[in-house]
């Protein structure tokens, strides 16, 4: 798993101004091997967003693009979908890329965090349950959140200063802290599929895909 995560980091690092946030010396060593910049963070963070907040206190920027290290299949073309051409007016700007789900088994898989939005593509709810429930119609495309997320500096400060919300605790999703407190989270559909390595099954799938690229 470490090998494939390192490969993913190597691909991402072709972009400019990239820092690897970690509390693990093994990852820091991989960064040194690849010649990457990294930021050592506290081991006490229990969420990735909390770790990125710490980075924002050390690295000055207007926006922080968070790329989860457990999604090594990320296509760098996806970054252009989430990075705005100009700075957003909302000082608490938060956005996430989503993937449409094509298989019923994926919809009921609790490791896939499903998302529903309003007409403006602002998130209403993120759940591990299959939402919405198709009682009245099946004419609906299910989506899941990915590990590509964008935060303004003030949004990260808000996250750090605000206690965990009820639904955030229940679903174990960081972005619900913003939603429950009235801040918009923009969902942007990406055609570039990602796979989060959460289970041995996921690891086997990703390993086969990456071996096919060698």
Identify the meaning behind each predicted range.
Residues 19, 25-84:
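Short phosphate-binding loop-to-helix
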Residues 140-214:
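Conserved alpha/beta core of the MobA/IspD/sugar-nucleotide pyrophosphorylase nucleotidyltransferase superfamily
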Residues 1-13:
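Single conserved hydrophobic/aromatic residue that forms the stacking wall/gate
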Residues 11-23:
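Short beta-strand/loop segment that forms part of the nucleotide-sugar
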Residues 18-20, 64, 95, 123, ...:
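Hydrophobic/aromatic residues located in beta-strands of well-ordered beta-sheets
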Residues 74-163:
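Conserved core of the sugar-phosphate nucleotidyltransferase
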Residues 15, 61, 89-92, 183:
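Short, high-confidence coil segments that cap the C-terminus of an alpha-helix
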């Amino acid at each position: 798993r470490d090998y494939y995560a390192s490969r993913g980091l190597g691909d991402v690092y072709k972009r400019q101004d990239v820092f690897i946030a970690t509390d693990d010396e093994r990852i820091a060593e991989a960064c040194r091997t690849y010649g990457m910049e990294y930021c050592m963070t506290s081991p006490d963070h229990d969420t990735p967003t909390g770790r990125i907040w710490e980075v924002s206190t050390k690295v000055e920027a207007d926006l922080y693009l968070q790329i989860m290290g457990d999604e090594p299949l990320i296509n760098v073309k996806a970054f252009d979908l989430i990075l705005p051409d100009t700075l957003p007016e909302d000082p608490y700007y938060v956005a996430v890329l989503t993937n449409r789900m094509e298989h019923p088994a994926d919809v009921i898989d609790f490791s896939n965090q499903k998302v529903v939005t309003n007409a403006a593509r602002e998130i209403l709810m993120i759940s591990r349950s299959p939402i919405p429930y198709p009682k009245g119609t099946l004419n609906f495309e299910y989506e899941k959140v990915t590990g590509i997320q964008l935060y303004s500096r003030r949004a990260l400060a808000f996250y750090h200063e605000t206690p965990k919300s009820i639904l955030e605790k229940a679903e174990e999703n960081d972005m619900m802290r913003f939603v429950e407190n009235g801040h918009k989270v923009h969902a942007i559909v990406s055609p570039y599929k990602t796979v989060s390595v959460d289970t041995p099954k996921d690891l086997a799938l990703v390993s086969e895909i990456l071996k096919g690229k060698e």
